[in-house]
Design a protein with these regions (language model features):
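N-terminal carbohydrate-binding/catalytic regions of secreted carbohydrate-active enzymes
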Residues: 26-105
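Short glycine/serine- and small hydrophobic-enriched flexible loop segments
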Residues: 58-63, 116-123, 181-185, 245-249, ...
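N-terminal export signals
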Residues: 1-17
Length: 336
């Protein structure tokens, strides 16, 4: 009898679903989501662009050796999102409006992935002109996006934004922003111990959260422990899907947060479906059979990742992107 994971990962693809190699996967993704000027488009968010997508696009272009697309994405990002007085980005760009940006606040995960992609471009691809910008962004993440943990003021929490709520009594925290490999590599490159400490403590907080009923998208950290966030609904949903991806990519597959999220995914009770969203009590809210989410399950369970096929290229931006990132993580970090 197959385990739950094995049953979910059995593809059953039709004959016309031809497998794609990594280069083909990248070209399909680029054709669907990257405009010629370098703007990465989220098709399910009214064709908006956001700092997360620009950061992911940079990372994927670098990983696939596509310098031209990398340059286009970075130039568009620099001209359209890097409007703040620091080195961080406004988080969202809305098309078909006179003022494309109506919220100048940043989203730290977008800045983190942009900085990491720029660092990798210089260090691994030899595109040296991007290193200084990577270091500048990393130092502003350190200076503006870290806050003391109210439970242990000597430890640092990664804030979801530079202006996010952070007081000695309550700090807003998004567990899915902890990409510890990126934080550590940027910390070493920038000679900034604060980023490395934030990576270490972030992994500790994720392990602590695995003792909660659900792994939350958002949570408040208080002197007495974890509490429902003031600005967001308490749930485990599409944000939290990234936690096992990032931990596995960072070589931390043994962190209990990985199995906590994957167990939730496998709780759907419907063949071939994943529970991609549950409420605070674990009640099912949304199911999906998208290959991108199945790839995260396979990565976290240390199984072989299903091949990406032509059928998968019809996915929307988010699962399509997570699928490519999961395969990249699998190539870069043998975590099991």
């Amino acid at each position: 009898m197959m385990s739950g994971a094995a049953a979910l990962l059995a593809t059953g693809l039709p004959a016309e679903a031809a497998p794609l190699d990594p280069g083909q996967c990248w070209r399909f993704w680029r054709a669907r989501f990257v405009q010629p000027d370098g703007r990465v488009v989220d098709d399910l968010q009214n064709a908006t662009s956001h700092s997360e997508g620009q950061g992911y696009g940079l990372l994927l272009a670098q990983a696939h050796g596509d310098e031209r697309t990398f340059r286009n994405i970075e130039e568009w990002t620099d001209h359209n999102l890097a409007i703040r007085q620091d080195n961080l980005m406004a988080w969202q760009w809305i098309p078909r409006r006179r003022d494309n940006i109506d919220d100048w606040h940043n989203a730290t995960d977008g800045d983190l992935f942009r900085a990491w992609a720029l660092l990798r471009a210089a260090r691994d691809s030899g595109w040296w002109e991007y290193r200084d910008k990577a270091i500048a962004i990393a130092r502003d993440i350190s200076a503006l996006c870290l806050a003391p943990d109210p439970r242990a003021p000597g430890e640092l929490l990664l804030k979801p934004g530079a202006e996010s709520r952070a007081t000695p009594e309550r700090v807003l925290f998004n567990p899915s922003y902890i990409m510890s490999r990126a934080l550590r590599e940027l910390g070493y490159a920038a000679d900034d111990d604060r980023l490395i400490r934030a990576a270490d403590h972030g992994e500790t907080v994720l392990a602590e959260l695995s003792r909660e009923s659900v792994m939350p998208d958002w949570i408040d950290v208080t002197p007495g422990g974890f509490d429902a966030p003031q600005e967001h609904e308490l749930r485990s949903s599409y944000d939290a899907l990234r936690i096992p991806l990032y931990l596995s990519w960072s070589g931390r597959n043994g962190n209990p947060a990985v199995s906590h999220v994957l167990d939730r995914l496998e709780s759907a009770g419907a063949p071939g479906k994943l529970a991609v969203s549950v409420d605070a009590a674990g009640g099912l809210r949304d199911l999906s059979d998208h290959a991108g989410y199945l790839a995260i399950l396979a990565l976290g369970r240390c199984g072989p990742l299903p091949e990406i096929t032509t059928q998968d290229t019809a996915q929307s931006y988010y699962p399509a992107t997570l699928q490519l990132l999961a395969h990249l993580a699998n190539r870069e970090q043998r975590h099991c």
